[in-house]
Amino acid sequence: MRYSLLFFIFLPCVITAVDLIHLHDGSPLFGEEVLSQTGKPLTRFLGIPFAEPPIGNLRFRKPKPKQPWRIPFNATTPPNSCIQSEDTYFGDFYGSTMWNPNTKLSEDCLYLNVYVPGKVDPNKKLAVMIWVYGGGFWSGTSTLDVYDGRILTVEENVILVAMNYRVSIFGFLYMNRSEAPGNMGMWDQLLAMKWVHKNIDLFGGDTSRITLFGESAGAASVSIHMLSQKSAPYFHRAIIQSGSATSPWAIEPRDVALARAVILYNAMKCGNMSLISPDYDRILDCFQRADADALRENEWAPVREFGDFPWVPVVDGDFLLENAQTSLKQGNFKKTQLLAGSNRDESIYFLTYQLPDIFPVADFFSKSEFIKDRQTWIKGVKDLLPRQILKCQLTLAAVLHEYEPQDLPISAQNWLNAMDKMLGDYHFTCSVNEMALAHTKHGGDTFYYYFTHRATQQTWPEWMGVLHGYEINFIFGEPFNQKRFNYTDEERELSNRFMRYWANFAKTGDPNKNEDGSFTQDIWPKYNSVSMEYMNMTVESSYPGQNRIGHGPRRKECAFWKAYLPNLMAAVADVGDPYLVWKQQMDKWQNEYITDWQYHFEQYKRYQTYRQSDSETCGG
C-alpha cells in the first residue's frame, strides 16, 4: 500500500502531462508527449504488456493474455528484447550492429509500443499500422532505431504499433504437445493483434482499418496471418516486404521440426538420442530446465545449409492447417488488399556471411572484386544451393545454365550479380511474386513495388548494391532525420513517396488514394497476372514519373524456380536410379570423351588447312 501512495505522490506531473488511458479491462497506463525528429508532437507509449511473461513453466507455451492491473503503468521505457543471438561477424561495424537488439535481453519480452500523432483523441479514428520485424525468426526487436515510428506517425497521421514476439527456439520449438506446440512466436503476434483490435480505439485508432506490415521474416509472418483462420478477424490489409509464407525458409513440416529438437538435445549434451525412436518427454524436460543462454548458444546446431533457419513456423494443424502452396493454390487465405515487393539485390548481404573463403572479412571493405572466374562462382553456388538441387546433375546444370553470365567479357561484378540474383530470386523475390500472383488470381487487389535505389547513407560497400532490408529506412522516414543523417533532397522525396504510399494503402486500400479522396501525382497500377505491372521505387532522376512502371519483375527467372525446376525434379525422381546412372555416364561421355575427340579432330582439320595453304603459297 505504501508503494501505491508513493507512486501517486511522485508522478502527478507526468500523469497530468499525458492523461491516463484505461484499457477496456480497466488497466490504467500513461505514455509521454515527445517530438519527432522533424519537430512535430506525438504521444508515445513504450513497453505496454500484452501477455503474461513467458517464463518458468510458460516457456515454450502459447502466450497468456496479460491480467488487468490497478496501479497506473508507466509506458515510457523501451521494453526488453526477446532472447536471441547477436551479430558479431563484422565487429562493431554499424551496418551489421544496427540490427542487433538495443535493449536488455530477457524471456520476459512480450510488450508493444504505440505511436499516436499529436495528443490522444479517442474520437479521431485514425488508420492503424502494425509493424512486424524480421530477422529470420531467430532475431529482431521492435525497438531498433531504424523502426523508430515517430516520423511516419506524424507525417502521415497514422497510429503505429510495434510488438515484440519470441524468436528462435523460444518462439518456434515444436514438440507436438501443449507444453511446446510450435508457432509460439506467431501466437504472440496474434495476441498483440487481438490487443490492438480490442484497445486501439482508446488511442484514437480505427478498428476497421488495421494493416499488418513487415519485412523478411516479418513479411513471412504477415502472409502466414493471411493463411491462418485464427488471424483473419483481427486485421484488414497486408504489406509484405521481401518475404512470404512460400519462401523456402519460412515454414517447415512437422517431422523436420521434431528432428531438429533431437539434434539440439544431443548438441546440448543432455544425452545421446537417436532420431529413429526419440523420447520427446526427455527432450522437453531438458529444454525446460536449461539456462536460456545455453539454448541460445546451441540454437544453430540443427542447421545444415544456406538459408536454413533453425526454428521457424510449422504446419501444426492449429495455427496453420496446410502448407502455404496448397493454401495459395486452393484460395484458402484472406482475400483483401495486398501491397508486396522486393529489393534489387536481396541476397548479397547473406552471401558475405556464408562464403568466408570468397568474401574474407580482412579484405571485405578494401576490395571490390571477389569472384573472378567460373570455377570460383560454381564453387560458391554449390555451397549455397539446397541439397535437393545439388544431388542431381540435371537440376544443378539447369540452375547454372539459367544464371551463368553469357555476355563477354565477364567481370567480377557480373559473377557476383549472377550469384546474388540466383539466391535472391530463390529465397525472396519469386516467393513474394508467388504470393502476389495467387492473391490477384483469387480476387484480391494487389500492388507490387521493386526497390532499386542504393542510399547515399548506406554503410555497406557500394559493390553490394540495393540490399535486403534497406527500404525500411525510407518507409520509416529516416532521410528526414537530418540531425543524424545526410540524405539528399531526392532521397527525402523518395522517402516521402514511400510513407505516403504505405499510409494511403493503410487508410484506403489504394496507395494512390489519399484519405481526402484525392490521388497522388504518380499513379501506381494494380498488379495483374498478365502484365504484372509494378512501381519502381527509386529517386526521380533514375526513373522519372510514369517511367517507373515496369513489368514482372524477374518474371522469366521466377517461372524457372516455380514451374520449370519443380517439374524437372519431379521428372528426374520418377525415372529412378538406373536412369540417373545412365544419364550421368552419358553426360560424362558427351562432356569429356566426345569433347576430347572433337578437339583432336578440329586440330587435324586445322593442320590439313595449314598444309594446303602452305602448299599453295609455295607453288605460286
Swiss-Prot record:
Q: Which domain of life is it from?
A: Eukaryota
Query: Where is this chain primarily localised?
Result: other
This chain's protein is named Acetylcholinesterase 1
Q: What class of enzyme is it?
A: hydrolase
EC annotation?
3.1.1.7
The reaction(s) this protein catalyses:
acetylcholine + H2O = choline + acetate + H(+)
Signal peptide range in chain numbering: 1-31
**Which residues get glycosylated?**
N74, N272, N486, N536
Q: Which cysteines are joined by disulfide bonds?
A: C82-C109, C270-C286, C430-C558
Origin species = Caenorhabditis briggsae
Q: Which UniProt keywords apply?
A: Cell membrane, Disulfide bond, Glycoprotein, Hydrolase, Membrane, Neurotransmitter degradation, Secreted, Serine esterase, Signal, Synapse
Task: Describe its assembly.
Answer: Oligomer composed of disulfide-linked homodimers.
- Gene name of this polypeptide: ace-1
Stored InterPro entries: AB_hydrolase_fold, AChE-related_enzymes, CarbesteraseB, Carboxylesterase_B_AS, Carboxylesterase_B_CS, Cholinesterase
The record's subcellular locations are: Synapse; Secreted; Cell membrane
The opening ranks of the lineage are:
Eukaryota, Metazoa, Ecdysozoa, Nematoda, Chromadorea
Q: Which GO terms describe its cellular component?
A: extracellular space; plasma membrane; synapse
Q: How does it sit in the membrane?
A: Peripheral membrane protein
Q: Which family does it belong to?
A: Belongs to the type-B carboxylesterase/lipase family.
Instruction: Tell me which Gene3D superfamilies the record gives.
Output: alpha/beta hydrolase (3.40.50.1820)
Please describe what this protein does. Answer: Rapidly hydrolyzes choline released into the synapse.
One GO biological process this protein is involved in is:
acetylcholine catabolic process
Q: Which GO terms describe its molecular function?
A: acetylcholinesterase activity; identical protein binding
Q: Active-site residues?
A: S216, E346, H468
